[in-house]
Regions:
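Structured, basic alpha/beta domains of bacterial-type, RNA-associated proteins
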Residues: 1-23, 27-124
Length: 124
């Protein structure tokens, strides 16, 4: 892993966040940023900032790094702690509302250089 970035306590449920994270996992950084920029999901803007942060971390770590070779190697979404709210209902009852949150982690890595096909594999 070249660089990582974490976004904790994001105020969107992990289920909704995973829908957008699945779009960028395994893509190059340029493709992932374009996908997030034109996504209509609300969480895409936060994930775009997170990806920009991971990219800045990679450039800070190695200034000579070729940014075009970076890919989203790992992207995980975990449940965060829910905020508990109450809603008044009839006959003096209270229903609990859970405002869910999530933790997002992104790791960038360099794509390996494509090796030439082996001679033995070519003979088969």
């Amino acid at each position: 892993m070249i660089a990582t970035a974490r976004l904790k306590y994001l105020g969107v449920s992990a289920q909704k966040t995973r829908l957008v994270v699945d779009l960028v996992r395994g893509k190059s950084v340029g493709e992932a940023l374009a996908s997030l920029r034109y996504s209509r999901k609300m969480v895409a803007k936060d994930l775009e900032k997170l990806l920009q942060s991971a990219l800045a971390n990679a450039q800070q770590k190695d200034p000579k790094l070729d940014v075009d070779r970076l890919v989203v190697a790992r992207a995980t979404v975990d449940d965060g702690p829910p905020q508990k709210r109450a809603r008044a209902r009839s006959m003096g009852r209270i229903y609990r509302i859970l405002k869910r949150s999530s933790h997002v982690s992104i790791a960038l890595d360099v794509t390996p250089a494509k090796a030439a096909p082996r001679a033995a594999a070519a003979k088969r």
